[in-house]
């Protein structure tokens, strides 16, 4: 079965949301009305192509892409920042090469998309602390702290009324910067656990999920690249540490392409 058929066959009940991890830091959200929201899908070997001279096989893709660029219909595409495993420069044109999909991104991500051939009328520039209303949800853009390597990274809270789904973007555990997300108490949190390149590790993610009083946490940002090893993203750490640091939050481990329905 193709991933498109799999996705089309998922039926989401009213007051429910489907969350699909598509590998690395990428997710799809599918709504009751069959709208598809994509967040930071990484679908090619773009990072390896970009960095292989410096890192060798360190950023070689080690897991297959869940779907091909252009294979599925996406309504909204959100990019948290311009790093290649979040804004895929080799996939972005095909992702937007239709009459349906719009990209919401920061200025640097916009530049990458335009360089890839995307028309500006397919892109809307966004920044932290903005709020945008859509038919089925409200988008609340939250600050994140990715250090000096990226100062314009954003987090996203998708407020569907019955549930708030939080995608942190790449961030470290800086409670002052993350205060907005903590105050909004999203029920579902999608958090990185690689603990490198300015990101949360498993313990940080558990503490952060506990701060937000999240009911569900789906970890990501692991096992895509050879550099994701040991302290740089071992999911067993999350499995062991969430019961200790976030006892009221259920850890949901997904394999790439697997769906979880909340509600």
Which residues does each PLM region occupy?
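Pre-active-site segment of Zn-dependent metallo-hydrolases
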Residues: 34-78, 90-91, 171-183
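Structural motif
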Residues: 35-37, 75-76, 102, 137, ...
């Amino acid at each position: 079965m193709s991933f498109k058929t799999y996705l089309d066959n998922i039926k989401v009940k009213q007051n429910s949301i489907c969350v699909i991890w598509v590998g690395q830091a990428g997710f799809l959200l599918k709504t009751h009305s069959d709208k598809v929201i994509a967040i930071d899908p990484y679908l090619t070997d773009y990072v390896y192509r970009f960095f292989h001279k410096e890192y060798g096989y360190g950023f070689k893709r080690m897991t297959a892409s869940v779907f091909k660029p252009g294979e599925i219909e996406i309504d909204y595409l959100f990019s948290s920042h311009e790093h290649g495993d979040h804004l895929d420069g080799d996939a972005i044109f095909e992702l937007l090469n239709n009459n349906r999909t719009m990209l919401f991104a920061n200025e640097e991500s916009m530049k990458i998309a335009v360089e890839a051939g995307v028309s500006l009328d397919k892109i809307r520039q966004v920044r932290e602390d903005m709020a945008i209303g859509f038919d089925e949800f409200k988008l609340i853009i939250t600050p994140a702290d990715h250090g000096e390597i990226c100062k314009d990274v954003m987090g996203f809270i998708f407020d569907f009324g019955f549930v708030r789904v939080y995608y942190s973007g790449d961030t470290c555990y800086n409670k002052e910067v993350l205060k907005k997300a903590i105050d909004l108490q999203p029920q579902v949190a999608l958090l990185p656990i690689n603990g490198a390149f300015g990101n949360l590790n498993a313990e940080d993610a558990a503490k952060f999920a506990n701060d937000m009083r999240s009911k569900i946490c789906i970890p990501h940002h692991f096992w895509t690249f050879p550099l994701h090893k040991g302290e740089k993203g071992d999911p067993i750490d999350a499995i062991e540490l969430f019961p200790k640091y976030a006892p009221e939050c259920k850890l949901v481990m997904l394999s790439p392409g697997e769906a979880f329905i909340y509600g």
